[in-house]
Amino acid sequence: MRRCLWILFFPLMAQAAGEGTWQASSIGVTLSNRGVAMSSRPLAPSEAVSGQMTLVAWNYRLIGPTPAGLIARLCSQTRCTQVDAESGTTQAFSGVSADEPLRFIWEVPGGGRLIPALKVQSNAVIVNYR
């Protein structure tokens, strides 16, 4: 019985310790030219939060093939980290204010038209903070 009570109260204790999570998502972008960087919409908490980011999980979905040389970065206002897969986690934003928005930056190096265009269906993050 005590074990069950512990499980029930654990989320409340974590919240009391100042830990939390926020998530945000947006529709993606279409990148038609090489050598041009394009940003997603800002991904920000829907309500006021305070604390420092600890772990950030990301996910994005592409429509069509991944262009050779694609560089995808996840950025705060003060730092960026390259993301090498459509989903994953990073601690690169540890210490960044939890209320700071994040955004994806998309780029395919080179010059000229990108055929087919890079089409990002969606971008999403889950931000853990303390």
Regions found by a protein language model. Give the residues of each.
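Disulfide-rich extracellular domains of secreted proteins
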Residues: 16-130
